[in-house]
Amino acid sequence: MLIDINKKKAEGEAMDLNHGVAFSGGNMEIYAGEYSDCRDADLIVLTAGLPQKERQSRLDLLKENRKIFESILHSVLQSGFCGIFLVATNPVDIMTRIVYEISGFSPEKVIGTGTALDTARLRYLLGEKFMIDPRNMHAYVMGEHGDSEFVPWSQAMMATKPIFDLCGETKGCHFQELLELEEEVRMAAYKIIEAKKATYYGIGMAMARITKAIFGNEYSVLTVSAYLQGEYGESGIYIGIPCVVNRMGIQRIVELPLGGEEKQRLHSSCEMLENTYQEI
């Protein structure tokens, strides 16, 4: 079911998607609905919001997108919805926290896409560099989905080989190159927006992956935006960290043994998000 403030657009999108059902390998009904139809939904994916402009920080979108969410959530909650929220609207960590606080839902049922896409971008770039299938590059992007995100390189591996060992065995590979990859990940969205005005496919695939983990009860480890309650020494904030995702939403948070500098970078990212939230 699709809901949009522009009902005609939602109807057109539903029609377009329905025309491809024959190629999907399954049966489904796609239609434009109303907020009252949310009552029996298992999952609501929130993507509404103003588009990010060229060189605009995700955090600059906050006040405008909060107003949009307040209106949407009022209607959704009136329907009696009691499933899982998946938030993709930027700035996603703060928007997810807004959904959590307005809805009153338990934190495991309110999830943000977090740094799932950033992690996929990182693994793609590492796969290219080392000529390895990205699915075998086990590295994460943590923190805010934005400028303060970081890679805990001490935890990065190819299969079970630490990335530092792999880099040492690769001619011409230096830690500085890894830092350049990290910066490339951080700037990726800005470059895409500059080229084509918005990001569509990567985040769409990230949302599909998280949804699959939920409906398939997969217990998959994904870097989603989750509510910290003492993990990593932080509390009361949503931020992108590795989590086990299953049918209940976030089954648990995975605490990685971060190094001293990595802990500080996570703390700084949390502090930045908290300060921004308090400015609302």
Language-model features: where?
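Rossmann-like NAD(P)(H) cofactor-binding subdomain of soluble oxidoreductases
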Residues: R58-R123
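Short, well-ordered amphipathic alpha-helical segments that serve as non-catalytic structural scaffolds
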Residues: E13, I44, F69-I72
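Conserved N-terminal Rossmann-fold NAD(P) cofactor-binding segment
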Residues: I3-A41, Q56, E274-E279
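Conserved NAD(P)H cofactor-binding loop of Rossmann-fold oxidoreductase domains
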Residues: A48-L50
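Redox-cofactor binding/interface segments in oxidoreductases and associated redox assembly factors
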Residues: I44-L46, V87
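Short acidic, glycine/proline-rich loop/turn micro-motifs
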Residues: R55-L59, E255-L256
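C-terminal substrate-binding/catalytic lobe of Rossmann-fold NAD(P)-dependent dehydrogenases
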Residues: S103-K109, D118-I280
